[in-house]
């Protein structure tokens, strides 16, 4: 999909760059593959804000996407490519030979009428899913499982992908787009290709109202607040904050590592995504 640039006929149109979605399905989603979605407004079960700057936005239906791809050796045909408001990637409606329908993440270069299959060893074509044990080294993949049978968790956002770079014992080595090199079990499933909509990051929404439609509220700088609200707040006139940048709770906010070093999966990371910054 290409990008659409608009002429500055109004202030909201100036600089506006959106994704051209003219080739996507224009109807409603399959009713049996959707369910209701209640907005939380960034609040948890106690009603307190745990994720700031969220609220409002257009109503959405949740599309049930098959991340597991565990219907083996049954070919499916791509019926249509659809927009999904709940993710940055597009989704594809597929129909299996036995009549069952499902939504999957649409990879790049997947077209209406294409055949896809999940198998222990399938052709290297966009949309086909298989475990790493049946995949040639060098394959570009997305929707990668971290635990066999759990469903894909890695490389699901628009334009993302990972590369299968090697095998070691019972593990497959994959290089993520962040630069991280990590291992997953060879029994884990992955789908061939890179995720659709790679131009998503090049959009410019042009006005605050469009972000409100998406459910994103304004971000207020700490230095614009009062001292009761933020460590950078207060002062006479405009100030610089007077200390290293911190969160509203006083923790360093720029570049501080927050990952728990005692995570069980830590030993599966061969090369950190931060390694290139260290010059390694």
From Swiss-Prot:
GO terms for molecular function: rRNA binding; structural constituent of ribosome; transferase activity. One of its GO terms (biological process) is cytoplasmic translation. Residues 256-266 have a biased composition (Basic residues). Residues 33-55, 224-266 are annotated as: Disordered. It holds the Pfam family Ribosomal_L2. The keyword rRNA-binding applies. GO terms for cellular component: large ribosomal subunit. SUPFAM superfamilies: Nucleic acid-binding proteins (SSF50249), Translation proteins SH3-like domain (SSF50104). InterPro entries: NA-bd_OB-fold (IPR012340), Rib_uL2_dom2 (IPR014722), Ribosomal_uL2 (IPR002171), Ribosomal_uL2_bac/org-type (IPR005880), Ribosomal_uL2_C (IPR022669), Ribosomal_uL2_CS (IPR022671), Ribosomal_uL2_dom3 (IPR014726), Ribosomal_uL2_RNA-bd_dom (IPR022666). Gene3D superfamilies: 2.30.30.30, Nucleic acid-binding proteins (2.40.50.140), Ribosomal protein L2, domain 3 (4.10.950.10). Keywords: Ribonucleoprotein, Ribosomal protein, RNA-binding, rRNA-binding. One of the primary rRNA binding proteins. Required for association of the 30S and 50S subunits to form the 70S ribosome, for tRNA binding and peptide bond formation. It has been suggested to have peptidyltransferase activity; this is somewhat controversial. Makes several contacts with the 16S rRNA in the 70S ribosome. Belongs to the universal ribosomal protein uL2 family. Part of the 50S ribosomal subunit. Forms a bridge to the 30S subunit in the 70S ribosome. This is Large ribosomal subunit protein uL2.
